[in-house]
Amino acid sequence: MRLNTLSLAMAGLALLAGATPALAQKKYDQGATDKEIKVGNINPYSGPASAYGAIGKSISAYFDKVNAEGGVNGRMVKFISLDDGYNPAKTVEQARKLVEEEEVLLMFQTLGTPPNSAIHKYMNTKKVPHLFVATGATKWGDPKNFPWTMGWQPNYQSEAKIYAAHILENKPNAKIAVLYQNDDYGKDYLKGFEDGLGDKAKTLIVSTISYEVTDPTVDSQMVSLKASGADTFFNITTPKFAAQAIKKAAELGWKPAHYLNSVSSAVGSVLVPAGIEASMGIITAGYIKDPTDPQFQKGKEWDDWLAYMKKYHPSGDLKDNFNVYGYTVAQTLVQVLKQAGDNLTRENIMKQAASLDMTLPMLLPGVNLKTGPDDFYPIEREQLMKFDGKTWQLFGKIYGR
């Protein structure tokens, strides 16, 4: 009997020894446990770019959905979203709070080029994932120098080159006026546009005027741009100022060929406040499905988005593509977390973010999401579209790779 008891004890020890490696496979950095994943976010719920607050609310609602359905690999996502008012100094304060006090595993979708620029070095020094930032500045795709920061949407310079190509093809003798926000965001778009026009930039662009994000309106800039005699207008503005520019152009009776950067293309947040009639004919580039477009208001993808909006985000505007954006970018992070499995270290989060190859339900047909160790630009395809008074009408080819 003693021999049998000893044998059983030895067998039990052997089983425990065999189980140890399996238990050890779970790896966590701060912000992750068996039950929870802390995700930090900074969004302008107040201030001059508060229209973008819709994105943060949409993301939060999507994580409510994820958690209600069991979480990611059995873990709840704790989404902590703070307001910075689109003020870079406040962004720094909020980032420190999230990283050092809340101890989030990663930062996700912090919005705006100036705010993200203010914490760019901090996030990389701390080696905290600075993932899928809500800005298309070209500098977010630099894994060699900033391995902890990754963009999500198409980069601004590439988008601006699409508008330049369309102008050169359709109005080779255009007289172009440009309004841009005087910061990294505006200058990035402007550089891409000038590069896209090439040698013709100096002769085709007849007026370039900037505004400050603290300006109350861009009315005076619009008066000056009209006076330049331009027949083509590139509008590089955030939603509040985009709506003002569209409205003022109509008041002035100025009807140029109007190109609007994609970051302000939301029908609900921009075009409706600006005036539907005033917005007629505007051209922009898109990569996500416009919820006002009848061709996309059918099928499982639409039904799923609509069900999410009705159940988890009933206060959200069904005409606002910021709610499609938030839903889609949140799905991207969920995929990264799924791939990470039980290895929820910051290093593995970045490894998984840099190994994506997927499509998502509300991306435009032909647009995919792909990354690699040397490719931190997840979405690189866009298509031009024109506003017809009700919705954006897609036209032409898909640009990008």
Language-model regions: role of each:
Residues 89-93, 100, 138-141, 146-252, ...:
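Extracellular/periplasmic Venus flytrap/periplasmic-binding protein
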Residues 25-28, 36, 51-57, 69-142, ...:
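Beta-alpha junction/loop-to-helix N-cap segments that form part of ligand/metal-binding clefts
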Residues 28-36, 40-60, 82-89, 111-112, ...:
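Extracytoplasmic "Venus flytrap"
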Residues 18-24:
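Sec/Tat signal peptide C-region and signal peptidase I cleavage site
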Residues 24-41, 68-76, 168-174, 343:
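Immediate post-signal peptide segment of exported/extracytoplasmic ligand-binding proteins
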Residues 98-111, 131-133, 176-180, 229-239, ...:
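Periplasmic-binding protein-like
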